[in-house]
Structure formats: structure tokens, C-alpha cells
Amino acid sequence: MIEADRIISSNAQLGDEYIDRAIRPKLLTDYVGQPQVREQMGIFIQAAKLRQDALDHLLIFGPPGLGKTTLANIVANEMGVNIRTTSGPVLEKAGDLAAMLTNLEPHDVLFIDEIHRLSPAIEEVLYPAMEDYQLDIMIGEGPAARSIKLDLPPFTLIGATTRAGSLTSPLRDRFGIVQRLEFYSVEDLTSIVARSAGCLNLEMSDGASHEIARRSRGTPRIANRLLRRVRDFADVKNAGIISEDIAKSALSMLDIDQAGFDYLDRKLLSAVIERFDGGPVGLDNLAAAIGEERDTIEDVLEPYLIQQGFLQRTPRGRIATSRTYRHFGLDKLTE
């Protein structure tokens, strides 16, 4: 199974952008969850506005789908400035970045998604821009080449990444604010689903919102995507109000169980239990057993399973926990 095809993939998919624009919170007061991040950013933004300064450069990291782009847009809205958006892989040449930087107005936000994928050449351009609001440009080639400095307006760089550890130390150290986004609680996701349903003019019971939330793997992007699919199901079934029963039927049709697992999650956990006696099993063996790339297991499947206590990552390999056996209705093997 390809990760991009999974309904519960936390990566962005076609069709997500339209609904995101309709339901994305614009201000911190609309932002549900991440209470510590919300409180801290409120203080930092208010302080910057009182001083009439640009906000410090901000690094946002965490698993996909938790709202890094949303938070970047909220920061720009709260500061009352424009936001220019790009991503690490798109910035191939120093000139690409220079063009964006020189078009910024004072205090504007430059948002770079997947900032861990910037090339070393682009990072070298960023260092003086972030630190001194200056841009070093080479004019000419060979012995006649010379460097000139351009002054930039004070701006805020917001970088987003799922792999903070992949950032180079010089780049990471230049961010004055670092925020980690955590998986959301079922309660917060229930509020997010209810809010999204309201933005889409859907009538939905509290039970339906909760049912979608608890199968969303702690991820708002997945919750909103499941809401769209439940809406489709309700439309075809001529359900005026999306009830808890309608939500359960729709999610069962999508093969998403009560823990938010789909076929691929269950395949991985079943392989650990049935083929490797609960583990420990090495990553390469596990990847071969389920026919998936090791990166897919390590970056996509494991984080949520480990966070929820269904899988343990040890020096000897992956181990299924007691919770996994209970989920499948099995007795844990004992030696």
C-alpha cells in the first residue's frame, strides 16, 4: 500500500487544500489544542507588537498534519503582516531565495516548509539574512567576482519540519523561538471536528464528532479528512444529521478501527506478533515481512504506534506490547 493513498495518512493529499482554506483557524483564539504553544506564542507576538519589532525567527517541528502551516499563518495574521510561502526542495538556487527575501516588506513572514531539505548553498545565504538582515550576493565570476551586501527589512523566518534532528546546528541555533507540536487529545480533536463541521454547514451530533476524533490518530489533518468522507457517506445515505451511528458505519466502511488503525497498521502489528513471536524484530526484517520501505515504517507508521503504546523500539528491535495483544484479542506469549 502506498502511504499517499491511505485515508489516515498524515501527509497532505489532493483535496485537503480546499477544505483547509475553509476551516483553517485564522487567529490564536480559534486555535484548538497545543495550550503551551498557544500561550507562549500569544506572549511573544504581543511583546513584538508592543516593541514594533519583527517577531523572532520561529522553528516549528513535529509529526505531519499537526498544524505547522496553520500556526505560521496565524502568526502572520496576529502580527498583521504578509506571509510568503515556499519549501526547502523548491529553493534550488541562491537566487530563488534572494528574490523572495528582497521582496519582503518590514516585519513580513517568510515561511519555509520542509526546511530540513534546504541545500547547504541556500543555508549559507540564510545565515546573514537571519542574523543581520543582510544579503550577501556574488557579482561576476572567477577572479573578477566580488561580494556586495544588500540590507533587508526586518522579517520573521518561520521554518517547519518533521525532522528537527536533520537541521544543521548553525541553522537551528539561529531560531529564537522553537515550538514542538504534539499529537492532539481526543477531546481537542472532538472540538476541532465540531468546529470544522460548523464551518462546512454540517449538522453533526456530539457522538459523531467524538467517534471521528478518536479514530484520527491524534492528527487534525486526518480528522478533517475523515469528516469529509463521513459527509460523503451521509449524503449518499440521505442522512440529514450526521449521527454517531452514521459516523461508525462510514468509518467501518473505510476499514478504520476504533484505535484509528487501517490495514497497514494491523499488518505491521500482526507481523510482529505472528511471524516474530512478538519480537524483538529488526527493522529490515519487518520491512521485508510486510513489503514496505523501512523509511515508511520508521517515519510514518511507528511514531503513532509507539506514542500510543502499541509498539516498543529497543536496541534489539521492535516489540509488540501487551496493549497490542489486547487490541487483537490475543493472549501474550510467555516463555
UniProtKB/Swiss-Prot annotation:
Where's it found, cell-wise? Answer: Cytoplasm
Q: Which InterPro entries match?
A: AAA+_ATPase, AAA_lid_4, DNA_helicase_Holl-junc_RuvB, P-loop_NTPase, RuvB-like_N, RuvB_C, WH-like_DNA-bd_sf, WH_DNA-bd_sf
Residues annotated for DNA binding in this entry: R294, R313, R318
Write one Pfam family the protein is assigned to.
RuvB_C
**Gene Ontology molecular function terms on file:** ATP binding; ATP hydrolysis activity; four-way junction DNA binding; four-way junction helicase activity
Give binding positions for ATP: I23, R24, G65, K68, T69, T70, E131, D132, Y133, R174, Y184, R221
| Tagged with keyword Hydrolase | yes
Principal cellular location given in the protein's record: cytoplasm
GO CC: one term?
Answer: cytoplasm
What UniProt notes about the protein's domains is:
Has 3 domains, the large (RuvB-L) and small ATPase (RuvB-S) domains and the C-terminal head (RuvB-H) domain. The head domain binds DNA, while the ATPase domains jointly bind ATP, ADP or are empty depending on the state of the subunit in the translocation cycle. During a single DNA translocation step the structure of each domain remains the same, but their relative positions change.
Function description: The RuvA-RuvB-RuvC complex processes Holliday junction (HJ) DNA during genetic recombination and DNA repair, while the RuvA-RuvB complex plays an important role in the rescue of blocked DNA replication forks via replication fork reversal (RFR). RuvA specifically binds to HJ cruciform DNA, conferring on it an open structure. The RuvB hexamer acts as an ATP-dependent pump, pulling dsDNA into and through the RuvAB complex. RuvB forms 2 homohexamers on either side of HJ DNA bound by 1 or 2 RuvA tetramers; 4 subunits per hexamer contact DNA at a time.
The family classification in the record reads: Belongs to the RuvB family.
Q: Give the protein name, as stated in the record.
A: Holliday junction branch migration complex subunit RuvB
- Gene name, Swiss-Prot/TrEMBL: ruvB
